[in-house]
Amino acid sequence: MSNHGLVVCGASNTGLVREHNEDTYVIADLHSGEITSPCARTDIPIPKDGLLMLVCDGMGGHAAGEVAARVAAESIKRRLVDEGSAVTRHPSESLEAAVAGANQAVRAEVVAHPERKGMGTTCTAALVLPRSLVVANVGDSRAYLYRDSRLQPLTRDQSVVSQLVESGVLRPENVEQHPLRHVLLQAVGTSPQVEPAITEVALQDGDRILVCSDGLHGCVSAEEIARTLHDTPDVAQATRQLVDLALKAGGPDNVTVLVADCPQNDNAAHA
């Protein structure tokens, strides 16, 4: 894959129902440690130590979810930056260890502030390397790869309803009405151990990466997401349109969307 420049954009919105935004996201150059500002559009070469695209969707009363998401995101970013080039040599192991460290960081926050007991967060961390993409996932935030006009899920929801759908007990169209639709099988910070699911794929010129909270995929269909990514070549505009789709669907939850376009050859057409 060429390395002419990576175009990345992130945006987060409280939605139309919730009072607080308990989502947190990070887009960070793991070589310099620099983080993009909210709603930023960043054109950069893929850093030699990788680029981190991270979404955490916190849960817990009295704004504790916001704290859990922030603590986890900062812990993961800091650990990966501190590891430096070791991340590129062992990306899966580095991501897994970073998520485990975030789990301990959130639990330490609860020890220091017992009133926050029960808080936790989802975590979907995508590590973009010059030739590959490595994703670690806990909970029901998601990562997708858009390639050749196809939206490919890179994560599986770690939730009760997802498990019921996979086992054939629940129809996909009935998920949104199920009383356990928000119950996760695991989250960062809620138990002594966490086991992130790790996925690694080779990247190609022109690939588009999407990382999002369930505030997007919970109310916007995969077909609508794919159509938006197909019809909107500009990364910043695609990011805004995906957030707008969630708001037009009622904005029932906080929504966070990160989109990155991999470098493509001058002669390559966008999928």
Question: Where would I find each of the regions flagged by the language model?
Answer:
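PP2C/PPM-type serine/threonine phosphatase catalytic domain
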Residues: 1-271
